[in-house]
Amino acid sequence: MSDILNTILARKADEVAERSARVPLAELIARSADLPLTRGFAAAMQASIAAGDPAVIAEVKKASPSKGVIRPDFQPADIAVSYEFGGATCLSVLTDVDFFQGSDAYLRQARDACTLPVLRKDFTVDPYQVYEARVLGADCILLIVSALEDAQLADLSGLAMQLGLDVLVEVHDIDELERAVQVPVPLIGINNRNLRTFEVTLQTTLDMRSAVPRDRVLVTESGIVTQADVQRMRSHDVNAFLVGETFMRAAEPGESLRQLFFAHD
């Protein structure tokens, strides 16, 4: 596990303790009881692919530990509207405060502004956060295999499904993938960014794609910048993408999405 990930996870444990002191778990559980149905994140991804289209998870991200502030003029609702207009299948919203300058409020603002399913992009390590995600209005959570033991993966994914949330299980290498496929969820993300060096190579996805079961949706994450990158992935039957920084640096994120995925020469 990388030093930065260790640092984030240590902080996340403290954050869960702080939040549960303010809003007890019992209160979150009660609030999660009679919520509206989620929007169906995995189903939306599968429907896009079945229609022959790329399934794009468009990320709403202000900053990152490696790049600092990516989008100074950060308006989550406007970004969400732009993404929906540009053809996104789903959204990913960063809610980590300390390392990504995210916010729970950003998720609410983005989701309220559109009809797309939304992933809560955070470092989920505790059942408290799963209930919290459901109460916030998320439709999907992220589980990072390198941050969790097998028992945690099973427990957190099981709880998420019980609450009606989809789960994106993220891996970076073949050992993590072997663990991920034991989790009975349809979405497996391959992060092309090495969290130890922050180097990005699309070859990571291509080297591992054949080991992903055919009944799962493989989502390639990080490093998709050009139409050639998209074509390279789709030529290898990789049809689901999570893209953030490329869009966040554009004046109109949704137009950037449309140009990257849907503009044909």
UniProtKB/Swiss-Prot annotation:
Q: Which reaction does it catalyse?
A: 1-(2-carboxyphenylamino)-1-deoxy-D-ribulose 5-phosphate + H(+) = (1S,2R)-1-C-(indol-3-yl)glycerol 3-phosphate + CO2 + H2O
Pfam families attached here?
IGPS (PF00218)
InterPro entries associated with the record? Aldolase_TIM, Indole-3-glycerol_P_synth, Indole-3-glycerol_P_synth_dom, Indole-3-GlycerolPSynthase_CS, RibuloseP-bd_barrel
Under Enzyme Commission nomenclature, its number is 4.1.1.48
Q: Does the keyword Lyase apply?
A: yes
List the keywords (alphabetical).
Amino-acid biosynthesis, Aromatic amino acid biosynthesis, Decarboxylase, Lyase, Tryptophan biosynthesis
Q: In which pathway does it act?
A: Amino-acid biosynthesis; L-tryptophan biosynthesis; L-tryptophan from chorismate: step 4/5
Checking CDD domains in the record gives: IGPS (cd00331)
Offer one example of a GO biological process linked to this entry: L-tryptophan biosynthetic process
UniProt family annotation: Belongs to the TrpC family.
Database matches in NCBIfam families: PRK00278.1-2, PRK00278.1-6, PRK00278.2-4
This protein is called what? Answer: Indole-3-glycerol phosphate synthase
Task: Report the source organism.
Answer: Xanthomonas axonopodis pv. citri (strain 306)
> What are the leading ranks of the lineage?
Bacteria, Pseudomonadati, Pseudomonadota, Gammaproteobacteria, Lysobacterales
